[in-house]
Amino acid sequence: MKKISRRNFLKVSGVMAAAGALAACGGSSSSSTAASSAPAAAAGGDDKFAALGDFNLIIGHSQPEGNPRFISMEKFAEDVKAATNGHLTIEVYGNGQLGTEKEMLEQVVAGTIQGMRGGQFDFSPRLLMFTLPFLANTREQVTALLHSDLAKKVCAEAEAANGTVIVNLCDAGGYRQFSNSKHPIKAPADLKGLKMRTNGMKTIDLTFQALGATTTSIPYSDLYMGLKTGVADGQENPWVNVDGMKFYEVQKYFTEVNYQFHPDPFYINAAFWNSLPQEYQEIITQCADAMGTYNDELIDQNSNASKQVVAYAGCEIYEPTADELKAFQEAVQPVYDQCVSEGICTAEEIAEMQKIVAGA
């Protein structure tokens, strides 16, 4: 029998716990029930989808095997295939095989590939309003924001502007934490002088600048080596990403600050989408909704296990007190004003998001 490591045991345990809750396109993790909630595949050998034609989608993303995005995308592909008797197939290329997230989105817009999933907002900057620091602090609040009429409006704007359709908006990985190789971060002043990696996202840059750090942009696929060689002192990512990419090998100090979550838009080329029969569009939408729910369940169940992996690796994890968190929250308030001034959102939209959060 192949020996399983502690790290993989923690991850597999979380995946198995979540698996029982998903239906393919609606509730169960078993691919044998994949068509149960989607438009049903024909019974008795009468394949109604044959007349609709065969279609194949190439979908890219940046996360490695074991990450909730990777697992949920594989499940999505299985569900769509089962729900259409194999006439609609999905080829998923994870781990950045098709390029950086920006490059993949450019390929989607150009029609080179049919879709990508990931927190890439260069062509959809107003989605950044959901990444304002300390906007939400529970799963219920995050879900309410991403399923809100405001989110639907912003997605529709993005679709009209860049030639894509956003078929799902879920969580990219859970709440994001700070780490660095120099010293513990317990207060905003501890970030001063640190060179923190960002992915170029405006709200991350503004947050670190408000906290006194300098920033350097490094692609996600290059981040491990950038941290190892000292191109950056630190970074921010959710626990599942820290675990999956083994950043704990090149970072010593972690702070569980829960400062931000990222939407995880699933983009599909609009021209390709419009070429699909309506029945296939409905199946993709239903299976994408189930995928998003499954993804978020995996994040919630795996985040603590991933945090344990980081601790087990010998890293220091600091959990700020309520007063210490308040100091961080107060320090980043200028980020809200800057986002309004740059047209990412309006003051009224900030108030609407805060109302959604308060009611969740």
Predicted segments with their positions:
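Extracellular mucin-like PTS domains
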Residues: T33-S37
